[in-house]
């Protein structure tokens, strides 16, 4: 049984992504996505922790008096929600900037796992393809933003925003992160965005669990600085094992 055909859970693919990112033939392709993530997410964390206490106290203060007893339960939930929201926003921005290099990383990981050449593009070819890659990133944002705005508005509703919204936001973030990172290997094969989403929906358990673990890691200081390249590697491993054969056949 080849390494890419070994069944894994969504969690397992993310953990496997760590091993792939550290492999000698992949490390050099990890560097540029890593730098982009460190700069943007690191700056975001500094801003978040400078203001977190003020934000949380404001939200807790908006609770009706008869729900004030929930404040001790809601504190950790709201902290996680704020961390996940801002980390997701800034990691999305980092992904947008690093998209060409994430695509190249996904290509090299697929070649490592499958032993087959994906294409003959070098760095110059990747740079030439940047407009198309950024258009794909924009397509993702068009899909994500209306839903994110709706959930953000839900956060502002007293009581409902402090109780239900954090759980909905976590589920939403898990799905969006699965789409964000799985899209790189799909896009390397020019598979349409809607077709990519439909493929992920066919294996929602693995897609959601992969995205959920990525979401958790994006909220952990220091570890969240390495999430981007690891998630690209893990999502590409999931593509090779779970989606590649069917997706390429259906494209014919």
UniProtKB/Swiss-Prot annotation:
Signal peptide: none annotated. One of its GO terms (biological process) is sulfate assimilation. The keyword Ribosomal protein does not apply. It is a multi-pass membrane protein. Pfam families: EI24. One of its GO terms (molecular function) is high-affinity sulfate:proton symporter activity. InterPro entries: CysZ_sulfate_transptr, Sulfate_CysZ. It comes from the Bacteria. Keywords: Amino-acid biosynthesis, Cell inner membrane, Cell membrane, Cysteine biosynthesis, Membrane, Sulfate transport, Transmembrane, Transmembrane helix, Transport. The keyword 4Fe-4S does not apply. Its main location: membrane. It is found in: Cell inner membrane. GO terms for cellular component: plasma membrane. The chain crosses the membrane at residues 29-49, 66-86, 141-160, 164-186, 212-232. High affinity, high specificity proton-dependent sulfate transporter, which mediates sulfate uptake. Provides the sulfur source for the cysteine synthesis pathway. HAMAP family: CysZ. Belongs to the CysZ family. This is Sulfate transporter CysZ. The lineage of its organism: Bacteria, Pseudomonadati, Pseudomonadota, Gammaproteobacteria, Vibrionales.
């Amino acid at each position: 049984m080849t390494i890419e055909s070994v069944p894994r859970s969504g969690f397992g693919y993310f953990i496997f992504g760590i091993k792939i990112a550290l492999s000698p033939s992949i490390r050099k392709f990890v560097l540029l996505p890593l730098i982009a993530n460190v700069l943007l997410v690191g700056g975001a964390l500094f801003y978040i922790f400078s203001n977190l206490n003020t934000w949380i106290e404001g939200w807790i203060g908006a609770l009706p008096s008869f729900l004030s007893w929930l404040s001790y339960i809601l504190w950790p939930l709201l902290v996680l929600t704020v961390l996940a929201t801002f980390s997701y926003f800034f990691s999305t921005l980092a992904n947008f900037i690093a998209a060409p290099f994430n695509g190249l990383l996904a290509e090299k990981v697929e070649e490592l796992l499958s032993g087959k050449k994906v294409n003959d593009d070098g760095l110059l070819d990747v740079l030439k393809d940047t407009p198309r890659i950024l258009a794909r990133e924009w397509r993702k944002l068009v899909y994500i933003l209306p839903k994110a705005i709706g959930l953000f508005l839900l956060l502002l509703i007293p009581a409902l925003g402090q109780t239900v919204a954090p759980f909905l936001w976590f589920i939403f973030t898990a799905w969006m992160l699965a789409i964000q990172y799985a899209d790189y290997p799909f896009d390397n094969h020019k598979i349409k965005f809607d077709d990519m989403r439909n493929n992920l929906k066919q294996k929602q358990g693995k897609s959601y669990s992969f995205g959920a673990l990525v979401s958790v890691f994006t909220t952990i200081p220091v570890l969240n600085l390495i999430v981007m390249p690891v998630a690209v590697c893990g999502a590409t491993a999931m593509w090779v094992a779970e989606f590649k054969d069917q997706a390429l056949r259906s494209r014919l």
